[in-house]
Amino acid sequence: MEDRAYDDAFVRIGHERVPSVPGGTHWGGGVSISARDQARLGQLLLDEGRHGGQHLLPAAWVRQMRQPVAVAPYYGWLMWLNRDGRSFPAASPEASFMLGAGGHMTWIEPAHDAVVVVRWLDSAATEGFMQRARAALRGG
């Protein structure tokens, strides 16, 4: 029997082979990203668009991403917000989140200058995880 595991890990879109990796890199609307890159993106947003002393995104744009939209006060520009503390009670009101399919989350927590990345978290475990993470960030 021929071993096709690696051949089957790719799909062809047009004339290009694209990885289709079960169990790890899909996030949100088809974004393929590692946990490390998720953290880097979160850090870029925590740092108001700066990286390595340069602005990669305008700071005003990043701030606007965290402003609630009129029809959904818990949502900004591709960011979930926690202003009233109801979405994620364990997080600060300044926290924002990028949430993806399968429990993938990038939690941007300015109150502790922290970015927390979670992958494949069962939604029933989210609040407990966040309580423990916030306690660890507080040093207790």
PLM features: residue spans?
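Acidic-and-aromatic substrate-binding clefts and catalytic sites of carbohydrate-active enzymes
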Residues: 32, 87, 124
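Active-site-proximal helix/loop microenvironment
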Residues: 1-47
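Active-site-proximal alpha-helical segments within enzyme catalytic domains
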Residues: 29-50, 104-120
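Structured C-terminal helix/loop/strand segments within mature extracytoplasmic catalytic/sensor domains
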Residues: 97-140
